[in-house]
């Protein structure tokens, strides 16, 4: 059976800030922020970046992360644009808060570039999440020193902003014990976000799988029976669900795509991604990338299960 490229369970672009040298920053990307942070801080011998090994900068605090990228390539594009805000094509020249290669060293510049990139039409429709592990950093972002959120055009904000429960605030780095305490607490916050995100996706996937495996479901649009069919073509085995797992909406992915595109506000030639689609049953706002993620993931899991049955 034909296969689609898997959307990663997690992929994010993060901002590190040195706990001991608060004016030192690092931007990177990873599918596993916990492992990556340990690498940067030297807890794991392999990995890490040369710049984060410089004397006096370790340990690092992960203060923010943008996650939910549909592919590694998309995350790397965001990372490169964030690192090169003075020349990236994803920020219009007149909107750049960083003008030169050596500019943009402050945290205000780093955070402003996040907003600029999230407002770009390429990243907007990925329905990304900007998460803060440090409340003080979130406040700096909200303060918006360069007025990026007001001065740069955008139809709407398709991204979510969140803050860790018990997020760090003012950093006390007077002693080694203080620094290590911040390091430990930050690692716990990163671990919690990563594990919770994966656990929620696993739970949701199981609920969707149960809907398909039990009872008789028909497509909301074409009224054909929804059922995994190993001998069928790929379009018959990709399904769309509502993000509200209590909603009974289910359809073929292709049918949902046609419906959402027919209701999009922009001309068809301007976009190939449904904009802010709403469930036709309960009107919950859907994240199209999540709809695709669960559709492909469910198909792959069902195909794998069928293959195992054949070998028994």
Swiss-Prot record:
**Which InterPro entries has this protein been placed in?**
GIY-YIG_endonuc, GIY-YIG_endonuc_sf, Slx1, SLX1_C, SLX1_endonuclease, Znf_RING/FYVE/PHD
- UniProt entry keywords in alphabetical sequence: DNA damage, DNA recombination, DNA repair, Endonuclease, Hydrolase, Metal-binding, Nuclease, Nucleus, Zinc, Zinc-finger
GO CC terms on record?
A: Slx1-Slx4 complex
- GIY-YIG domain boundaries: 9-92
Name any one GO molecular function.
5'-flap endonuclease activity
Mind telling me which CDD domains this protein's record contains?
GIY-YIG_SLX1
Lineage: superkingdom: Eukaryota
The Enzyme Commission number assigned here is 3.1.-.-
Q: Where are the zinc fingers (SLX1-type)?
A: 219-282
Give me any GO biological process, just one: double-strand break repair via homologous recombination
Where's it found, cell-wise? Nucleus
- Name the cofactor(s) required for activity, per the record: a divalent metal cation
This molecule's function is given as: Catalytic subunit of the SLX1-SLX4 structure-specific endonuclease that resolves DNA secondary structures generated during DNA repair and recombination. Has endonuclease activity towards branched DNA substrates, introducing single-strand cuts in duplex DNA close to junctions with ss-DNA.
> Which family is this sequence assigned to?
Belongs to the SLX1 family.
Q: Which PANTHER family does the record cross-reference, listed alphabetically?
A: STRUCTURE-SPECIFIC ENDONUCLEASE SUBUNIT SLX1
Query: Its quaternary structure?
Result: Forms a heterodimer with SLX4.
The molecule here is called Structure-specific endonuclease subunit SLX1
**What is the species listed in this Swiss-Prot or TrEMBL entry?**
Candida glabrata (strain ATCC 2001 / BCRC 20586 / JCM 3761 / NBRC 0622 / NRRL Y-65 / CBS 138) (Yeast)
């Amino acid at each position: 059976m034909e296969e689609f490229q898997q959307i990663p369970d997690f992929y994010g672009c993060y901002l590190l800030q040195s706990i001991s040298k608060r004016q030192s920053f690092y931007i990177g990307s990873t599918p596993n922020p916990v492992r990556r942070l340990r690498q940067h801080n030297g807890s794991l011998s392999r990995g890490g970046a040369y710049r984060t090994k410089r004397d006096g900068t370790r340990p690092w605090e992960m203060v923010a992360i943008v996650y939910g990228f549909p592919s590694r390539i998309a995350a790397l594009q965001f990372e490169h644009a964030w690192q090169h805000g003075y020349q990236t094509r994803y920020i219009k020249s007149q909107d750049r808060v960083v003008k030169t290669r050596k500019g943009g060293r402050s945290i205000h510049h780093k955070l402003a570039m996040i907003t600029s990139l999230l407002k770009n039409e390429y990243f907007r429709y990925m329905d990304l999440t900007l998460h803060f592990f440090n409340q003080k950093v979130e406040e700096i972002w909200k303060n918006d020193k360069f007025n990026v959120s007001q001065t740069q055009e955008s139809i709407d904000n398709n991204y979510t902003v969140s803050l860790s429960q018990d997020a760090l605030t003012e950093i006390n780095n007077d002693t080694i014990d203080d620094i290590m305490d911040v390091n430990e607490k930050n690692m716990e916050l990163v671990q919690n976000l990563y594990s919770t995100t994966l656990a929620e996706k696993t739970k949701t996937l199981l609920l969707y799988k149960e809907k398909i495996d039990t009872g008789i479901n028909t497509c909301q649009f074409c009224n054909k029976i929804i059922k995994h069919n190993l001998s069928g073509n790929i379009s018959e085995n990709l399904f769309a669900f509502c993000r509200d797992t209590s909603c009974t909406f289910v359809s073929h992915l292709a049918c949902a795509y046609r419906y959402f595109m027919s209701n999009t506000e922009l001309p068809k030639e301007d976009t190939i991604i449904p904009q802010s689609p709403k469930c036709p049953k309960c009107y919950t706002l859907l994240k199209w990338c999540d709809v695709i993620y669960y559709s492909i993931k469910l198909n792959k899991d069902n195909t794998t299960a069928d293959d195992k049955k054949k070998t028994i």
